[in-house]
Amino acid sequence: MKSLLSTLVIIMFLAHLVTGGWYVKKCANTLGNCRKMCRDGEKQTEPATSKCPIGKLCCVLDFKISGHCGGGGQNSDNLVTAGGDEGSSAKASTAAMVGAAAMAGTPTKTSAPAKTSAPAKTSTTTKASNAAKASTTTKASNAAKASAATMAGNTTKVSTAAIASTPAQASTPTKANST
């Protein structure tokens, strides 16, 4: 029984020795094997990254080198460049959104106000007695006078100077209810 087991161990040892399972040094980030000559379907990598002993080459399979080193359809440098371009455009669009939100949140005077016949009244409390009054987010008295902040979904109060419907009303102060 012992001789059968020892014979099996010797055969397994020789099989691994011949196939190179135990004594093959890995190279190119464990993608390739160090050999004297590369086989069919393998390519030699650069000597600087091989880590093979003198006189041996680092051989990596074609499909592994194309995905790892960029030898396939796309170059790895192009992938990095494309990612950098996307990041800069994303940063630019984010900055534009932040700038637009900051502008929409601050009350500004209108140079060309909307002309309506309704009076420019504002109130601190929301009264739902008139259907022409704006929603509670802007607290404006007329829906036509709502600013761009309301259209964007911003919930800031709109100043009376920004809601004035005519230039004459913009120059005169408007009355506010204090109830």
From Swiss-Prot:
The record's account of how the chain is modified after translation: O-glycosylated; glycans contain alpha(2,3)-linked sialic acids.
InterPro entries cross-referenced by the UniProt entry: Beta_defensin_dom
Keyword field contains Secreted: yes
Record GO biological process: innate immune response
Keywords tagged on the record: Cytoplasmic vesicle, Disulfide bond, Glycoprotein, Secreted, Signal
Region (Disordered): 105-152
Tissues showing expression: Specifically expressed in corpus epididymis and cauda epididymis with expression in corpus being highest (at protein level). Not detected in other tissues tested, including testis, prostate, seminal vesicle and vas deferens (at protein level).
GO cellular-component term (any): acrosomal vesicle
Low complexity: bias regions: 105-150
Extent of the signal sequence: 1-20
Main location, first listed in the record: cytoplasm
Pfam annotation, one family: Defensin_beta_2
Keyword Secreted annotated: yes
Disulfide feature: 27-58, 34-52, 38-59
Superkingdom, natural source: Eukaryota
Protein's cellular compartments: Cytoplasmic vesicle, Secretory vesicle, Acrosome; Secreted, Extracellular space
Function: Probable component of sperm glycocalyx. Likely protects and facilitates transport of sperm in the female reproductive tract. Probably released from the sperm surface during capacitation.
Family statement drawn from the similarity comment of this UniProt entry: Belongs to the beta-defensin family.
Entry protein name: Beta-defensin 22
